[in-house]
Each structure stands twice: as structure tokens, then as C-alpha cells.
Amino acid sequence: MSIGSLAIVLHAHLPFVRHPEYPDFLEEDWLYEAISETYLPLLLVFDRLAEEQVPFRVTMTLTPTLVTMLRDELLMDRYGHRLDLLCELGAREVHRTRNDPVFSRLAHFYREHFESLRGAFRERYKRDLVSAFRRLQDAGHLEIITCNATHGFLPLMQQTPEAVRAQISVAANHYRLTFGRDAPGIWLAECGYYPGVEKFLAAERIRYFFVDTHGVTDATPRPLHGPFAPIYTEAGVAAYARDPESSQQVWSSQHGYPGDPTYREFYRDIGWDLELDYIRPFIQPTGDRKNTGFKYYRITGKTQDKQPYDPEAARQQAAVHAGNFLFNREKQFEWLSGKMGGRTPVVVAPYDAELYGHWWFEGPWFLEALIRKVAFDQKTFRLVTASDDLVEHPENQVATPPLSSWGAGGYANMWLDGSNDWVYRHLHHCARQMVALTKDFPDASTLHRRALNQAARELLLAQSSDWAFIMKTGTMVDYAVRRTKEHLLRFQRLHDEIRGGNIDEGWLAHIEGKNNIFPEIDYRVYRPG
């Protein structure tokens, strides 16, 4: 009989990036890389485990923005073309390296890898990854949860409760339409919680959410079991805390598994290493270089001297690390089991899904090895979801978590500082305007309704926490600033045209086609009160 429960949570999210006005757009690569490196590999792992009847339970967030992009015909057409290019590059690399015994093996590995992904995308999954994830949920292997509609950071939106409610309500409705049931839980974007938000979750029949460790350990009154059991908020929604130990083993840049010298080096790619004339057809149309996914070196060490990558050695190391993770969880549960007053401890191990495959190429191999080892090599603990835990332990302590996030510093530092604070006065102003529009136009006519619905979309897209995060980290700042301003300006124009009664239907149709997220939205989700 097991004495512990491990809840693995994979948070899959990307901001809504769709540019039909350009034939090729660099930031769309975020999606294409994530499909090739994370979503397809994870699906193949989960399907293989299911077909071999290996028991497993994993929680996975599929955010509304990500689901929308994965179901968009234009983006899936473009991704299919990207796979064709990668397969062509694989064939060229096999020819280029034919006389090099080391790199020839790697070229063959990548050619077979991308051809396998292309076959899975087109033949196995029929270009519909969301339905593939849904089948795994319907079969009882995954528990898919939702997230704020556009990943808005709720603690910085609480000045307008209607805006918070809209982020949650739109997401919950989107989930019902996509998966045919209520969302059992929610990943609050960035684990961003503030006291009171749970009432909006309860209204949508959402039963649980996740917070960082201090979101539970610093709750009032102090929880008896620390981060190893959920607490109920006053609204009856359960809060689960991240376990710091299991997170550190994977996330830590200094001590985590992904830094092992055997693993693939993320920052060496032939898109940067090879002659420009050779690689030009596979990089940006401007001739600017970018990653291709063909990475021939392993981490090796902290210097620039890198040794060739060995996929088989890396796969074996992933299995070793899976065994180490298993051993550490067994010892953790053995230590906890006598300290919980009869309550089964639950260790919550949440990660960005993109860590598994994108940042850590071997991550899907690690996860598959871990799931197999949990199923067959031990009896100390089992894999669960939060829903499973609540069924087994329906009575839990009632407490109020503090405002918290899982970002650096644990609060709102990443999304509110000198690099991005300028956005909030505009976001708050537009949110108040949206509430007022809903009050003043409670039953709008067809054209006005379209404009009001699009105004709601533009506001939601402007609220994405990704833009403030990018401004803070300094990666693609110009794009993040541009997107924020574009959505705010579109909202303001729509607001003014609605108020003035002179809606430009041609322009409205244009932006409806460009930002086509949430076609089912009803602007009255912003109704006052």
C-alpha cells in the first residue's frame, strides 16, 4: 500500500501569436518549436505508455491561447510547412556529413527524428493535437485543467473585479466547449493568487488551483501539514502548494538534472554555426540567423569547448536521473508519512511543460522512464491528480492564502517594475471602460455586439502577463511593447466608435480575422457587479 501521492503538473502555455498579414513571422516560431520539441514528444510518450497499459496520472494545463493556436488552420498549415523544411534540412545534413562518422550519426538521428514528428503530426494526429490530449483525458491518463483566458496576472488586475472574473469565466467557458466538461482545476497564471479570487473560481465550479510553497505555508491560520496537503479557501476551492524539493531537482540551473554534461546543449545550433549560404533557406527570409533544432553538441561543461552530443548516452542518463528522482521521492514520503496525522502526503511537482523537450531535450525521455519506474519499480507512492486527492481526502483545513506567485521574489516583482509599470494605468483604464460599455449597452445590436465582443478580445489580449514578463527579462522587448500598444489602441478605437455610433465595419472585420481568439465570447462577461 502506498504511503504518498505525487502530483506531476505540466503547465503548457504560449501567448497568442498569429500574424496572417505576414507569410513568415519570427515570433510564431515559439509555437512551432514548442510543438516539435514538447507537445508532440509528450503526446507520443503518453500514447506509448497508454498503449502498453502502463498506469499513470498526470495533470496538464492547456491554456486557452495555446489551444486556440493549436486548432488554427493557418498556423497548422505553417507548422506543416516548417516540418517539411526541417525534413529537407535533415536530408541535406545527412549528405553534408556523410564522411564524418561522428556528425553523420547525429545528422541521421535528426533526419529520422523530424520525419517521425512529421508522420505523427499528419498521420497519427491528423494535425489535431488538442483532440489527442482530450482522448488521453477521456481515457483517464491526463487531467487537463484550464488557465486564465490570456494568462493575465490576476493580483495586478484586482482593482477591477469584473476584469478578473472575465479572465476566469472566458477560460472556463472555452474549456467546456473544447473538452465537453467543466474544468476540474485551474492554473492561475504565474500561480498569481490574491485573497478573494477563489469566489470567481467557485462560480465556475472549479475545484482547485495551485500556488507556490509560501502560498500555503504562509496562509492564515497556519496550515498544519505545510505544503504537503491542500487547504480549502472560504469559497470551498482547494489550494495546492508547490513542493520545493522536487522542483529544485529539475528546475535548478545549478543543481537540476537538465544541466548534466551528457545532455544536449541548447545554445549551439547549426542555424548559427554553419555557413550562411548553406543555411539560408532554413532561417529567416531576411537572412537573419535563428535556431533550426539541429543541435550537435552536448553541454560538456561551463566553457565554450563542447563535445559532440550522443543521444543514446543522453537517454540512458535520463533514465538514471528518473531513478534518482524516484529514490528521492520514496525517501521524502517515508519521512513525511509519520508526520501527517494519518493524512496521505501529496507532493505537487509543477513545471512549465516547455521545460520537457524545448529547454531540456531529454525531458520527455526522463518523464517516460519515471512513469514506468513509478508503475513497476516501487510501491511507496502513486501518481495522482488533485482531483484524485480530493476524492480520497475530502476534508481539509480551511485557511486563506496570501497574495503570492511563483515568480522571482514570490510576489509581483516580475510583472511590476520600472521596465513594465507603464502598462497598468492603461490596462486599468480600458478595463473600467469595458465595464461601462457593458453597462450602457446591455443588449447591443448585431454590429454593435460584434464591436463590443472584439473590444473584449482586445482587452484580454492586452492583459497577457507574457508582455510584461518579456519587458522585464529583456528578450523580445520591442515585440512585447508593440503587442501591448496595438491591443490597447484597437480597444480604444472600438470604444470610441461604439460610443460615437460610427463603427467602421470593414476595419472591424479585419481585426476580427486577425485576432480570432474566443469566437464564442459574449462581451457581457464584463457586466458590472
Residue ranges and their predicted role:
Residues 61-66, 148-150, 185-194, 214, ...:
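Short, solvent-exposed turn/loop segments enriched in Gly/Ser/Thr/Pro and often Arg
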Residues 125-135, 154, 159-162, 166-169, ...:
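Gly/Pro-rich turn-and-neighbor structural signature
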Residues 45, 49, 136, 174, ...:
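Alpha-helical structural signal in soluble globular domains
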Residues 2-57, 62-105, 224-529:
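Active-site and substrate-binding clefts of carbohydrate-active enzymes
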Residues 21-23, 45, 57, 111-113, ...:
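A short alpha-helix capping/helix-coil boundary motif
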Residues 74-138, 144-158:
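Active-site-proximal, glycine-rich beta->alpha crossover segments in alpha/beta enzymes
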